[in-house]
Amino acid sequence: MWTHRLAAFALGCSALAAPACAVDDSASAEDDLTSVTARSRTLQFEGYVYVAPTASDSEILNAVRAQTQTAFGALRTAEIGVNNRELKAVDVATFTRANVTIVNPDEPSEPGTPMIRVRYRYTDDAVVPVDMAKRSALGLAVMSPSYKSQTKRILEECTANDSHAQDFASSIWYVFDPSLASCRKAMAAEQKAIDDASASLSDPTTQVVKEEVGRLYLPTTVSLGPDKTNQGKSYPEYDRLFAGGVKPDTLVFGLVNGYLDHGAHDATDSGYAEWMDTLKEALKVRDFKLASIEPAEDLSTFDVGGKTVKSASFADLVAWETDNELPDGLTYADRLALKKAVGAKLVGHWITLAAPVTVRLGDGAPRPFTIEILTYFGADSSPVPHKKAIKNSDVFIYNGHSYIGYGPLDPGNFSVADFPSSYQILFIDGCVSYNYYEKDYIPLKAGGTKNLDLVTNGLEAPAYNSGYALGRFVSRMIDGSNASYAELLKAAAATDSLRVVDGELDNAFDPDKARLVVE
C-alpha cells in the first residue's frame, strides 16, 4: 500500500488556477458515507487550458478532461480518493474564456499567435484520512493536456521512478506526484522561466509567452468542504438478507477472487492463499459443508506420490492450506504435491458451501434457513465469473486487481439485467475502487440505493491479509450479532484503505426495533 503523505506547497488561493477557493458543498448530490478511516468531503480545484480559436466545444472539454485526469495521481499520492472516474465529471458551466495572444517580448513588432484560455472549476466528492477531517486546503498540481508527449520527463521529475511507477508509464497520470522534491524543483524552474519571459509584456492581461502556454505543470489549490461523513449508526438490511433474495430461504455470498501475481496462474498464486483465508474465517463461524463443485470433482480422494490421501470435509482442504495441518506420513515432497493436487481441483471451479441455520426476526417465529457461499478462485480479465456471482448472490465480494477501472468489473460491462432485483451488497476490494466501481453501479441497480449498498476503497488496498479481512467481514455478517457497518469495517480493518460504505443511509433495519437472531 502506498502511503506517501503530501508535503504542502507554499501556495494559497492565489495560485495559477482561478482565485475562487470556497467550496460550495451544495453542489454534491451524493449521500454521506459511512467509514472508520475516511472522512467524506467535497473537493474543488481550478485550472486552465489553452486552445486554438477554432476549437470546438468538444475539443475544449477533452482538453480540460485530459488535465483533470492528471489530478488523480496528485490526489492519490496525497491520500485523497475522488468519486468520479478519472475526474471526468467536468462542469462546462464553470468555463470562462478569454482571448489571448502568444507573443515574443524580444520581437514586439511580431503580431503573435491568437489562442483562447479556458478556465474551469472542478468539483467532486472525496474521501480523506481522518487526520485531514478539518484541513481546508492543500497545494497540488495538474499537468498540461498534452502531458503524454513528455512521459519520460514526468517519470523522472514527478514520480518515484521505481518499478511501480515505470509499470504505469503508459498511464503516467496515475503515479504523478507533485509533492516530490524533484517535482517541486521542476515546477519552480518552469515558473521562473515563465516569470522571466513575462516580465516585459506590455499587457499581461491579454498577452502570454510561449513558456506559459507550453508549461507542463500547473500548480493549483485543492479546497475541501465540511466533513459530511455519516455520524450515526447504519446497518445492512439484515431482515431482507435473511428473508431470502436470489434464492428462497437462503442468503448467498458470492466470493470471486482474482489472481494477484504476474506468474503462473494456479494455486501457487498468492491470491489462492488469500481466498483460503477468507473461507477459513467463515468456517469458524458456521458449519459450512460442500454442496457442489462445477465442473465436478472428487474432493475426498487425492493421489500423491503413490499414496491415497483422504479428506473428511471441505474444511480439511482449507486447513491443509491455511494451517499446514496435513495428514501424517507424508514427505515434504508429498505435502507440496498434495497442495498442488487440491489446487488443481479447486482453481477455476465454482464451489458452493452451505450451512443450515435457524433465524428469527423480532417476535417472529423461528424458521429454517440456509447460508450459502458461492465462490470462485482464478478470475482474471474476463467478466464472466463476476457476472455470474453478481447475478446469483445477495452479498458479492471481489478480491483482486482493479485494472485501473478497465477490468472485468468495469460498469460498462454490465447492464440492469446483470443484477438481481432484490437487495444486494457489493464489496469491491480492489485498489481505488471508490473511483472506479462505485457511483456508476447505482444506476444499474433497479431501485438504486434502496436495493444496493456499496463498499469500496478510496486508495490502493494491500493484497496481504486481504483474505483474512474479507473473511472477518463475512463472519461478522453471519454470526448473528447484527453488526453495524462501522463494526463490519472494523472487522476488516487489516486492509482498510479509506474504505467507505455508500447507499446505506436509506436502510431501514434497526436491531433495537427488531433484532435478528441467527442460530
Q: Which stretches of residues belong to each language-model region?
A:
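Active-site-proximal C-terminal subdomain of hydrolase catalytic domains
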Residues: I425-E519
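N-terminal Sec signal peptide cleavage junction
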Residues: P19-C21
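Catalytic-core segments of thiol-dependent peptidases
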Residues: D316, E321, G329-V432
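Non-catalytic propeptide/linker segments at domain boundaries
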Residues: T101-L346
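Short, low-complexity, disordered segments immediately C-terminal to signal peptides
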Residues: D24-S35
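Long, solvent-exposed N-terminal ectodomains/accessory regions
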Residues: L33-S136
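Bacterial N-terminal signal peptides that target proteins for export
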Residues: M1-A10
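Extracytoplasmic/secreted cell-surface and envelope-processing proteins
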Residues: H262-T268, S381-P383, I404-N413, N435-K439, ...
